[in-house]
Amino acid sequence: MQRWVLHIDMDAFFASCEQLTRPTLRGRPVLVGGVSGRGVVAGASYEARKFGARSAMPMHQAKARVGFGAVVVTPRHIVYSAASRRVFQIVEKRAGIVERLSIDEGFMEPEALVGATPEEVKQWAEELRAEIKEVTGLPSSVGAGSGKQIAKIGSGEAKPDGVFVVPVDKQHDLLDPLPVGALWGVGPVTGSKLASMGVETIGDLAALTQKEVEISLGATIGISLWNLARGIDDRPVEPRAEAKQISQEHTYEKDLLTRQQVDAAIIRSAEGAHRRLLKDGRGARTVSVKLRMADFRIESRSYTLSYATDDYATLEATAFRLARYPGEVGPIRLVGVSFSGLEESRQDILFPELDQQIIVPPAPDTDYEVGVQSSSSSESTQVEAPQDVALSMWRATQDVYHPEYGHGWVQGAGHGVVSVRFETRSTTKGRTKSFSMDDPDLTPADPLDSLDWADWFAENGETGDDE
């Protein structure tokens, strides 16, 4: 009987959550991410994507592309995590087992769809999306096919806010023209090998013989990719254990001999790991840098922050402070950066622009034995905010509360005045009020209150307090 695997992907999830809870932002080009000089876009609304802005892009570059109308919002991960839990509560109730890939996407294989027609699958997916939209207010896209690969490609075709079903007899119409890099597992190295063979599309790979694939790519990985290219994907949908660490490392054909080469390698690995961290939706408390020297010695050093963060500038700065160079340890062959101590809830940093200054790790003692890790912690290393910053108290996009006007968010602050827009998910576009910076009635608020899901939080034991 026909097997149907579905892939659901929330549309521009972080930005959609901001537009949901702050009606003023609906229809505007929203960029979610760090505001520091090395800030990175964690999420971009479709209005911002029209200008070429995208996730993982340096914030200054995204702002330049969008122009004067760009709205930059500090991430509120506690809101995104709560929204994700509510979305997948709905998905699991309808579909049963769900294989979560990240905070905003997952696979499912509903028993009710075994042997179903493409039309029935489309109707089921539309009903799921409609319930998610009705309950949470958030848009989603669903792809469906005979396996995970095609389902995930299908959800990309469905975006934004749609369903794309790929019948078995039509799957090669979708797969064959796509670049071979669209296949799961085809990275730069494999892609380079395939290119040298004249393989540019998935159809080109599917047309190879089994012997050609085994000789060029190996009997295990090669055949797996070949099967995916031919539309054969029997991987089961099953729950995944939550990742405890996110990392990326690269081995170099030629030894790294200069500081500049090592710096470039750290940036390459840090950026790759950070892209995966953003997709995961959690923040990291611990940063580690791994080096393997030309003589195969391995050195790994780590540093633990006092809070979890996904701010790229902070994480990169920490990695650089952990780095060692050829003048100290000799020629280097491998460089890796990893993030661990992953947490859904992270400390709300009042002064995000000071993040990089907080990281002042002492020089750790290094053990050169293979696999031994030395570490240090930031628990005893604190940098106080300057008095003029500390007195300011308010930062743009911060959640606040006023006893007369209710929940709102800071639109701007300066010269002794703070402007607040009062609105939540369940209101219309809110009005703006200005207050003295030290007005006692204006207080910091729980970001979760902007969702107006008090009943659901009570039923599910959810709170906005960090544990």
Swiss-Prot record:
* Cystine bridges: none
Q: Where are the transmembrane segments?
A: none
Top enzyme class: transferase
- Return the cofactor note field: Binds 2 magnesium ions per subunit.
| Binding-site positions, Mg(2+) | D9, D104
User: Where is it found, in Gene Ontology cellular component terms?
Assistant: cytosol
Which GO biological process entries does UniProt record here? DNA-templated DNA replication; error-prone translesion synthesis; SOS response
Q: What is its EC number?
A: 2.7.7.7
Stretches the record annotates as Disordered: 364-386, 428-449
Family the entry assigns: Belongs to the DNA polymerase type-Y family.
Q: Which HAMAP family match?
A: DNApol_IV
Extract the PANTHER family matched here. Answer: DNA POLYMERASE KAPPA (PTHR11076:SF33), DNA REPAIR POLYMERASE UMUC / TRANSFERASE FAMILY MEMBER (PTHR11076)
Quaternary organization: Monomer.
Please identify the protein, giving its name as recorded.
DNA polymerase IV
Q: What is the lineage of its organism?
A: Bacteria, Bacillati, Actinomycetota, Actinomycetes, Mycobacteriales
